[in-house]
């Protein structure tokens, strides 16, 4: 009969395992007020954080999917374990010894459980690490030495060696109290024709750990030509602990720097991870025995606190060969599923990061990451490179190939920018034609969705005739232009309802009005004393008109002063507040784009202090932008 864990132990472990620390191993949390932390929910996909942790209460709750509970409930859900196993896992974490009642032995009670499998893997890792010092392991040590990995590096990454004996590990662990069924369940042993045998033999091994540092499996490299298993690399099979689609080598070492720097570097192999970390790129990770996929992305997004308002950097580092280029193009297909900014860094001359470090030193790896190329640009240029641009037919073929790629880009501003660049890369003189084709492709795939604020008003504005004499159409803004709609509505609000527009409008800079005539109207309002001048109606309009000598600007002031705001009177205050918030958000978005552009041109390693200071500014700007977006998207704001 299974032993029972005392209520006293359960309470003590719950108290000792602080929920914010436990959750923090899986989710990047940010302060969200008194006794409140928030992050992206690990239990469902979301773009805006709705997962909250209350440290003083010891509970978590997601307002998106409804999951919630104490620290035990969190571990049960995220690790797919029973309550007892969650208690044991947290006990191991804090070093608490559990007293079982009514149990024969801990081995009998724990047989086959997650905690036993973890213990078996930990013991195996220690066994393999010790075996690396044996005479038999000389080729494994030589392999590491030839790649400039010393004994300290081997210890840091837990490198080990699987001896040649068919059951060396199995017998060692059985002497420690583990049974064959447990070792088989952990993927360490298997049943051979003549009895139990080890899974790995005569190979260099790396332990694969969770973000919490638990060993869940191993990766093994072939060293000897007479190895019966021809595959260069083999991994632990799928087990209760080891799921190749959701484990990453190096995540335990990289997670804190990924969370701190909001940047993850994805490489292709174990030695590449080692090389990157030893060179100072401590955010490097690699998938294990499978392609980098959706679950890996989700894990990194949570660590980077990546959402639709702040976007972390995901940098793919590939070998400089055709396989690496193909991998980069494959990554392009998944980029749109990720809110984070994706980049590509390709090592020169077909070298992987390990080879590059060996030949050119640590600085070469840091420079490789610093010179990253946006994934969009890399994918488009790679496609163009396959075409003969010296012929008209080749240029047409390049456009046909690349226009759909650019059309996938969701951000319309970024999409237009890449359309312009595409024209230049291909050598197409008519830039407007390329932009038009890309926009058409984007509409065919998925029409960009307008925000709730303004969609109805824009449709109505499109039905209104343009006022004013024909001679002024060349300089006056088009009232049907949706990109200028927030500017127009903000000016109408300030001219017709100055008291409602108030200080928020007065705080808007002239630079926020991108059309010259709208900027001129904004300047005239400011010169007239702003909305706080205490005037309204015709008197206020006359005062504003007196501040300009331009007949075009004066006529536009009159037009904006009488053009109807398509909203009910009782909704005017919220509507105007939303319009002003939208305009602020658009202006702030441009400032954020400039900061991001500067960050992309900087190296977080070589320019650490300046990079992180600017990064802090970006986070603050994104937070303010988010509050503006929330204010501008209320249901009551649409006309």
Swiss-Prot record:
Residues 262-348 form the Toprim domain. It comes from the Bacteria. Mg(2+) 1 binds at residues 268, 319. Disulfide bonds: none annotated. Mg(2+) 2 binds at residues 319, 321. Keywords: DNA replication, DNA-binding, DNA-directed RNA polymerase, Magnesium, Metal-binding, Nucleotidyltransferase, Primosome, Transcription, Transferase, Zinc, Zinc-finger. Signal peptide: none annotated. A zinc finger (CHC2-type) spans 41-65. GO terms for molecular function: DNA binding; DNA-directed RNA polymerase activity; zinc ion binding. Residues 460-479 are annotated as: Disordered. GO terms for biological process: DNA replication, synthesis of primer. The keyword Ligase does not apply. It catalyses: ssDNA + n NTP = ssDNA/pppN(pN)n-1 hybrid + (n-1) diphosphate. Its EC number is 2.7.7.101. Binds 1 zinc ion per monomer. Binds two Mg(2+) per subunit. Contains an N-terminal zinc-binding domain, a central core domain that contains the primase activity, and a C-terminal DnaB-binding domain. PANTHER family: DNA PRIMASE (PTHR30313:SF2). RNA polymerase that catalyzes the synthesis of short RNA molecules used as primers for DNA polymerase during DNA replication. Belongs to the DnaG primase family. This is DNA primase. It comes from Mycobacterium tuberculosis (strain ATCC 25618 / H37Rv).
